[in-house]
Amino acid sequence: MTLLQAIILGIVQGLTEFLPVSSSGHLVLASYYLGWWEKLPLYVDIATNTGTFFAVLVVLRKDVWQALSGFFAGLTSSTARQQEGWRMALLVVLGSIPTAMIGLGLKPIFEELNQPLYVSFALIVTGLVLWFTPKSGLKRNAMSLSWLDATIGGIAQGCAVIPGISRSGSTISTMLWRGATSDLAPRFSFLMYLVVSFGVAILGIDEVREEGLQLAPLLGMIIASFVTGYIALLWLFSVLKKGQFKWFAPYLWVVAAITLIKVAMG
C-alpha cells in the first residue's frame, strides 16, 4: 500500500464513520472504483478506525470523562449511582454486549459481503432507515433511558457488521425512535462506538502485524481519519440539531444505483 492510498482511505473513513452513510461500505466502494482490491483487507478497517476512535475521544472528552468518573464513583457511592455519568456508563456497557455477540458471531460470515454488489443493497436499506427516522425523539435524557433501550441500540449497532449498513445511522435512528433527544442519541451512539472500536483494534493487532504494513501508510490512515473524522463529527451534531438526518438517504441511493449499474455492466 502506498502512502497516497493510505491517506485516501483514511479520509474516506473519517468522513463516513460518523456521517450515517457507512464507512465500511464506502471503503469497499473506494477500493472498487480506484481498482485497488477486489476485497478490502481487514487491516485497513482496523487502522482507519483507530484514527476515528481518537476523534471521538477529543470531541466527546467531557462525556467520556463523565461516564468513566461516574462509573468508578458509583462503585462505592450510592449518591453517584443517581447521577447521569453512572447511568450512561452502564447503558453503554449494556448496549455493547449484544454488539459484541453479533460482531464476534457473524463478522466472519459478513466479511464475505465486502463486495460492491452487496454493499449497494445495504446502502439502499440504510437510506430507507434514515428517511423514516424522526427529526427528534421524545426529549428523554440518559436518566430516563431503560436497559431495553440500550440493548436495542446495541443490537442496531451490531447490524452494522454488514458492509453498507451505517453504524451511526442505525444506532442514532434507533435511539431517536426510542425517544432520546437529538443530542443524546449521537452521544450514546459514539460512546458505544468507542467500546466496540477499542475491542476491534485489540483483536486485530495480530492481523496488522502479519500483513507487515509499513509505518508510513499506517500513520497516514490514522492521521487522515482522525482529522476528517473530527470535522465530520462536529458537522453531524449540527445536522441533527437542524433535523436534517434524512437528507443523507438520497445520496446513499444515488451511490447505490451508480454502483449497481457499473457492476451490471462489468
From Swiss-Prot:
It is a multi-pass membrane protein. It comes from the Bacteria. The keyword Cytoplasm does not apply. InterPro entries: UppP. Disulfide bonds: none annotated. It is an enzyme of class 3 (hydrolase). GO terms for molecular function: undecaprenyl-diphosphatase activity. The chain crosses the membrane at residues 1-21, 40-60, 90-110, 113-133, 145-165, 188-208, 217-237, 245-265. Coiled coil: none annotated. It catalyses: di-trans,octa-cis-undecaprenyl diphosphate + H2O = di-trans,octa-cis-undecaprenyl phosphate + phosphate + H(+). Pfam families: BacA. GO terms for biological process: cell wall organization; peptidoglycan biosynthetic process; regulation of cell shape; response to antibiotic. GO terms for cellular component: plasma membrane. Bacitracin is thought to be involved in the inhibition of peptidoglycan synthesis by sequestering undecaprenyl diphosphate, thereby reducing the pool of lipid carrier available. Catalyzes the dephosphorylation of undecaprenyl diphosphate (UPP). Confers resistance to bacitracin. This is Undecaprenyl-diphosphatase. It comes from Acaryochloris marina (strain MBIC 11017).
